[in-house]
A protein has these predicted regions:
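Flexible, glycine/charged-enriched surface loops at secondary-structure junctions
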Residues: 35, 102-109, 168-176, 235-240, ...
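Glycine-rich phosphate/pyrophosphate-binding beta-alpha loops
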Residues: 207-215, 271-273
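Internal hydrophobic alpha-helix adjacent to the cofactor/substrate pocket in enzyme cavities
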Residues: 217-240
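Extended, charge-enriched "interface" segments that sit outside catalytic cores
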Residues: 269, 275, 286-433
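An anion/pyrophosphate-binding glycine-rich loop and adjacent beta-alpha core
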Residues: 23-159, 251, 256-339, 352
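A glycine-rich dinucleotide-binding beta-alpha-beta segment and adjacent secondary-structure elements
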Residues: 145-211, 239-252, 377-429
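Glycine-rich loop(s) and the adjacent beta-strand/alpha-helix scaffold that form part
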Residues: 1-43, 165-166, 170, 223-231
Length: 436
């Protein structure tokens, strides 16, 4: 760990280091390299002048992470925003010679999209200010996380710079920001199950695979844990495709492309984003989880009920006739083009400005159908509407994904000699050899 020129062995702050682990792995032929990450200063909220900051409240309308059970809203804590200024920048620049990132102390690569405050100053010298976000670490603590101020500068430089910000002029800190270098292992030496290709029965997950972020680690840990359990009982492996989950995209990227910088999952990395929607995660994964024994029967039954309810709404809309003379005045009142001929209700839902909510206000039969106990949950009507409104796009993307699956399922023997395949480029042969 690096704070200025001070270097300390450890895990995270106040956690012990793991010694000789890398050496015990690499002696079997597993490749390793180094990466770095950083974390911001932690501030005591009792020393902050919040009157000099702008409050940033949380969302008032948000989706649940789980559709199981009743919706329970937790107490919302606001974040606060402020900005750096020229004096802050001058203070930080005065300490660049002692910054591990610029004095040669750290040579490894850090996250592309999480630059330190000193990197921002060097990369964007024309900027007079950078935004900062003060975030509570919890309801029962005074510790606050200063997002945007990741740093490995000496502690006195960090503190002096903070004191140049009006809201933080009296700031006291729990601990300074610091950088940490760590080993990771080449993820292209892993199978899609996250089992090592070199050491049978050894599974890797998280930061050791070159990723950064809690969700990235959690997703890999879930897959690695499932496959480790399956391996112990001799069952086949569990793998997810790129069109089934973002975890599948992440693992496929790691194991086929490798990493040369800390990997973070973005929706832009997925080519099947219409299939990987927030509303259909249960549709994609519940049955798989139930078959593996990691989802209980009540979750599976709830999903079956939801699927049937969605189907009923879609069937109702697909069969419900709309007469133009009856609906046109109401459509004009909603600001949408009147019909030239009669149609089915599902055709109206495909229009951009129409949805189940506003149509239910002008079509009593639809309102009655949506208000039945089995259909009235928001997540059910939302999922049904998405399936109807984007039906053509979903089907087209499904065809593209299925075509790719047919190509992916053509197996190449492990001992295939790519060096003799002169019909492809040198780079192509090198990539092929690397993944044998």
């Amino acid at each position: 760990m690096h704070v200025g020129r001070k270097m300390v062995e450890g895990g995270r702050c106040a956690e012990p280091a793991v010694h000789n682990f890398t050496e015990s792995i690499t002696r079997w032929g597993i490749t390793t390299a180094r990466m770095k990450t950083g974390t911001p200063v932690r501030i005591d909220k009792r020393s902050v002048h919040f009157e000099d900051m702008e409050e940033q409240p949380g969302d008032s309308d948000f989706h649940q992470f789980s559709y199981m059970g009743e919706h329970r809203v937790l107490k919302q804590l606001p974040c606060w925003t402020c900005y750096t200024n020229k004096k802050v920048h001058e203070t930080l620049k005065s300490g660049l010679a002692d910054s591990p990132l610029y004095n040669g102390q750290i040579q490894s690569t850090g996250p592309r999209y999480c630059p330190s405050i000193e990197t921002k100053l060097v990369t964007f010298p024309d900027k007079d200010q950078h935004p900062l976000f003060l975030e509570p670490e919890g309801e029962d603590t005074n510790e606050m996380y200063l997002n945007g101020f990741s740093s490995s500068m000496p502690m006195d430089i960090q503190l002096n710079a903070l004191h140049e910000i009006p809201a933080l002029r009296d700031a006291k800190i729990y601990r300074p920001g610091y950088a940490i270098e760590y080993d990771y292992f080449d993820p292209t030496q892993l199978k899609h199950s996250l089992e090592s290709k070199i050491i049978k029965g050894l599974f890797f997950a998280g930061q050791v695979n070159g990723t950064t972020g809690y969700e990235e680690a959690g997703g890999q840990g879930t897959v690695a844990g499932i496959n480790a359990a399956l391996h112990c009982v001799g069952d086949k492996t569990f793998e997810m495709n790129r069109d089934e989950s973002y975890i599948g995209v992440l693992i496929d990227d790691l194991t086929t492309k490798g990493v040369d910088e800390p990997y973070r999952m973005f929706t832009s990395r997925a080519e099947y984003r219409i299939l990987l929607r927030q509303d259909d995660a249960d549709a994609r994964l519940t049955e798989k989880a139930y078959e593996l024994g990691i989802a209980k029967r009540d979750r599976y039954d709830w999903w079956i009920e939801k699927k049937e309810a969605i189907g009923r709404i879609i069937e109702f809309c697909a069969n419900y006739p709309i007469k133009k003379d009856e609906i046109n005045p109401k459509l004009e009142a909603l600001g949408t083009t009147p019909l030239r001929a009669g149609c089915k209700l599902i055709d109206l839902i495909a229009r951009p400005h129409l949805n189940l909510t506003n149509l239910s206000e002008i079509i009593p039969d639809l309102k009655a159908a949506l208000e039945t106990p089995a259909n009235r949950k928001e997540e059910i009507t939302e999922a049904a509407e998405i399936k109807m409104k984007y039906k053509g796009y979903i089907e087209r993307e499904r065809l593209i994904a299925d075509k790719m699956h047919r190509l992916e399922d053509i197996k190449i023997k492990g001992r295939f000699n790519y060096s003799e395949l002169h019909e492809i480029s040198t780079e192509g042969r090198q990539i092929g050899r690397a993944h044998v």
